[in-house]
Amino acid sequence: MKCPRLLTRILNARKTLTYGLLLLVLGGILGLKSLGHHTASQLECNSITLPAEQTLPGAGALRIAFFSDIHNNAGLFNETIAHIEQARPDLIIFGGDFVVAYQRFMRTSWAVEGLRRLSAVAPCMGILGNHDYEKQEQVERVFHTAGVPLLRNGAVDWKTPAGTTLRIIGLGDYNEGDDAPERCMKACGQEEHPVLLLAHDPESRWRLRNYDWDFMLSGHTHAGQLGNPFTGTYISFRSSMPAGCYDFEGGRRVFVTRGVGSILGMRFFCTPELNIIELK
């Protein structure tokens, strides 16, 4: 009689252990998901100061608000606008991916109103990101209605607060095969003005190495949405420039933002950000 009882106890113990492990795994998954959603909601406004003459030679002192990768997140977009209104920049740049390719983008009044608020602060312009091409007509209509230009292989000459001319060039998306630098850029050494280049993916810099530009602003990477909590670095499998300011050939610089939104609404040790870039 002892053997069946012992066997029953063993089976019950195994069931208890199995259920316990399942609950532990489930709790871990839910906890991880909660952490990811929480981190993705913690928008930071980060400032960086760069020497003007080594970044945009001849442009003079300048304050640029730069944000990218909204990914249809109206709440974080409103937070971004509030930070920018407080910072009072001279120029506002959007680096692409206003939407998410797999989400609907139908009720767009929040986007139009937000872009209009930004335009009331300072001159504002942007570019398309790879996700935007899935909803290109809607995105372009939103920006047009708000009066904010989207540069797609085009350039504008903008008068800086110092009275100098800054050439701002915006490219179509590199990953979508829509970038055409030959339409709007000159060969190295041919530009008469400092050039601020807007390109959604920082990896496109290699294609642009023989064109004349000084400072490139990019997004796209989200800094991998994953950070190393021990080193403070970011883990990205698709870019050698996940986030921050990098030196490039010919004394040029590339600045990559971590972005505002995120894919699947989760980040780990990698908070979203907008950037205030001070050139002094």
List PLM regions with ranges.
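Mobile, glycine- and charge-enriched loop segments
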Residues: 40-75, 169-202
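Membrane-embedded segments
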Residues: 58-151
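N-terminal membrane-anchoring alpha-helices
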Residues: 1-58
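A short C-terminal boundary segment appended to hydrolase-like catalytic domains
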Residues: 3-14, 19-22, 206-210, 264-280
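Beta-strand-turn-beta hairpins that frame and shape the catalytic cleft
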Residues: 51-65, 148, 156-170, 247-254
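Binuclear metal-dependent hydrolase catalytic cores centered on His/Asp/Glu-rich metal-binding motifs
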Residues: 141-149, 154-155, 160-199, 205-206, ...
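Conserved beta-sheet core of the metallophosphoesterase superfamily
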Residues: 202-276
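Active-site metal-binding loops of divalent metal-dependent hydrolases
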Residues: 66-72, 96-99, 130-132, 154-155, ...
